Amino acid sequence: MAPARAGCCALLLLLLGLWVAEIPVSAKPKDMTSSQWLKTQHMQPSPQACNSAMNNINKYTEQCKDLNTFLHELFSSVATTCQTPNIACKNSRKNCHQSHGPMSLTMCELTSGKYPNCRYKEKHLNAPYIAACDPPQQGDPGYPLVPVHLDKVV
């Protein structure tokens, strides 16, 4: 009887571990719309050092995010990207849009540490980006479409 119980508990712990591992590091907080979360994660009109900027993001998940890109633009500028022609996203949805041209951005890549002591290296560049856009949700600005996901840097 005891070995069967031990096997059951081990299986339960394994399943629990797999379930916890599936929670994405960039999971959107429940009290934010997708657009608000994009603004929190990726909008930074005035560049900041990655180590301090990433602390503001990592506190939501209490994990070190591996990679993050900050766009040094106002939300209104990124929202105008949603007015460019639709293109396919990495996930094959057709709600992505490419920026009008290169934009100033910073890429932060995790180099070491465990939360809350995450350490990042930064890379500054000017490059176009692709963002996914959707109709606004309650609490979003009143644009016809709002950016909800930074799909990639081109």
UniProtKB/Swiss-Prot annotation:
Claim: Chloroplast is one of the keywords in the record: no
UniProt superkingdom: Eukaryota
Active site: H42, H149
Binding positions (substrate): K65, D66, L67, N68, T69, K90
UniProt subcellular location: Secreted
PROSITE patterns referenced in this protein's UniProt entry, alphabetically: RNASE_PANCREATIC
A Gene Ontology molecular function term of the record: nucleic acid binding
Cystine connections: C64-C118, C82-C133, C89-C96
Protein name as it appears in the record: Ribonuclease 8
Residues in the signal sequence: 1-27
Organism of provenance: Pongo pygmaeus
GO biological process, any: innate immune response
Enzyme class name: hydrolase
Predominant location category: secreted
Function text: Has a low ribonuclease activity.
Native organism taxonomy: Eukaryota, Metazoa, Chordata, Craniata, Vertebrata
Record's keyword terms, sorted: Disulfide bond, Endonuclease, Hydrolase, Nuclease, Secreted, Signal
Coiled-coil regions listed: none
Keyword Hydrolase: yes
GO cellular component, one term: extracellular space
UniProt record similarity statement: Belongs to the pancreatic ribonuclease family.
EC number, UniProt record: 3.1.27.-
SUPFAM superfamilies referenced in this protein's UniProt entry, alphabetically: RNase A-like
CDD domains, per database record: RNase_A_canonical
